[in-house]
């Protein structure tokens, strides 16, 4: 007779699941930095205190500044606009390429939008380029060349290569896959290193974005008093945290990201670059958005987005409007474009929204 052990499963004992007990500790309504409501004066104090605490949480906001040492890599005439490619130093340990799209025949200084791409092959995918650098004339993929479209709507568009993508991936050529040394994904590897150092990838990305704004302020042809931001997916997260941390961003479009942490980020697989250690101290995503209020926000969400589910989006929107923006007397400043579609840029309201708010 063959003997065997008695197997037990999570169907018998839910407590076998490591996350089961952790969820009992997830109490956003008790978080020390949750949105408090109350009078405007108290909310402004909360924003100041919480912004400082968030800077510590995401990390790297006090990395040593350096000279930008800008290099203009190329200038391409696209007919109705010019595309410049630049390389700047954002801190002592980082260089960042970015594209600057400048519409022709419009009065200067121009309003500016930061265009922040999501996962994929990088910034080229939003400025009309294939991964190998070849030009394309028609939008492709979930980004839909939204940087080009913003430019054609009259904005100067600053589109950075976000850390961990495109020309900013890590070199692991020293590893030997043949003997079993696994080649890590750049996002995952950078996130783990950032966590080890007490920060996060989003902290690095926010710092890069803020330094890019600093650099652009020196240009007389750009009006940084009319600065917006637009991003999708990981770029939507980048947009949200950048606007939370930098009040120079006067309006933003968050596409394919604004759901709830419980209903999206922790409900399924997401990239390690989407996580911040200790973020639970700030409540839910609609508490964090209080750092942007009452500045205008548009949320884009596809009804069939599999990784930012619609019910979580709608719940977050309802709380944001009724609890957060209403507290500032600005419920009308939070808009939504819920469209029939998946995880993708829509644009039906987004471009006009930024025109309305920034021009």
Predicted feature residues:
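N-terminal targeting or regulatory segments adjacent to alpha/beta-hydrolase or S9 domains
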Residues: 1-82, 90-91
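Proline/glycine-enriched tight loop/beta-turn segments at coil->beta junctions
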Residues: 93-96, 104-112, 119-122
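Cap/lid segment of the alpha/beta-hydrolase catalytic domain
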Residues: 108, 116-210, 217-218, 263-268
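Mobile cap/lid helix-loop segments that gate and shape the active-site cleft of serine hydrolases
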Residues: 188-189, 193-199, 206, 211-212, ...
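Alpha/beta-hydrolase fold nucleophile elbow
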Residues: 221-233
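Short glycine-enriched nucleophile-adjacent loop
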Residues: 236-247
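Short beta-strand/loop motif that positions the catalytic acidic residue
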Residues: 292, 299-301
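C-terminal catalytic histidine-bearing segment of alpha/beta-hydrolase fold enzymes
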Residues: 324-359
């Amino acid at each position: 007779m063959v003997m065997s052990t008695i197997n037990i499963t999570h169907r018998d004992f839910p407590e076998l699941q490591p996350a089961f007990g952790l969820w009992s500790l997830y109490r956003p309504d008790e978080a020390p930095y949750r949105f408090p409501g109350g009078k405007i004066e108290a909310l402004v104090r909360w924003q100041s205190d919480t912004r400082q605490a968030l800077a510590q949480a995401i990390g790297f906001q006090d990395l040593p500044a350096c000279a930008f040492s800008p290099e203009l890599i190329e200038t391409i005439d696209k007919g109705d606009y010019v595309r410049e490619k630049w390389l700047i130093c954002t801190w002592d340990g980082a260089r960042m390429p970015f594209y600057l799209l400048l519409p022709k025949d419009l009065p200067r200084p121009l309003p500016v939008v930061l265009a922040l791409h999501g996962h994929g092959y990088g910034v080229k995918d939003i400025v009309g380029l294939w991964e190998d650098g070849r030009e394309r004339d028609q939008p492709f993929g979930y980004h839909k060349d939204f940087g080009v479209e913003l430019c054609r709507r009259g904005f100067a568009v600053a589109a950075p290569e976000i850390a961990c993508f495109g020309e900013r991936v890590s070199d692991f050529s020293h590893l030997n896959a043949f003997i079993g040394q696994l080649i890590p994904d750049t996002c995952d590897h950078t996130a783990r290193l950032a966590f080890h150092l007490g920060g996060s990838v989003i902290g690095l990305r926010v710092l890069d974005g803020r330094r890019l704004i600093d650099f652009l302020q020196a240009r007389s042809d750009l009006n940084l008093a009319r600065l917006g931001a637009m991003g999708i997916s990981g770029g939507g997260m980048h947009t949200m945290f950048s606007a939370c941390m930098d009040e120079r961003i006067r309006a933003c479009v968050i596409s394919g990201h604004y759901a709830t942490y419980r209903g999206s980020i922790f409900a399924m697989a997401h990239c390690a670059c989407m996580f911040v250690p200790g973020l639970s101290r700030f409540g839910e995503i609609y508490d964090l958005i209080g750092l942007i209020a009452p500045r205008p926000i548009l949320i884009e969400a596809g009804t069939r987005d599999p990784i930012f589910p619609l019910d979580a989006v709608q719940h977050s929107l309802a709380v944001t409007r009724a609890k957060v923006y209403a507290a500032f007397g600005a419920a009308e400043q939070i808009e939504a474009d819920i469209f029939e579609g998946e995880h993708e840029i829509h644009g039906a309201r987004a471009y006009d929204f930024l025109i309305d708010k920034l021009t």
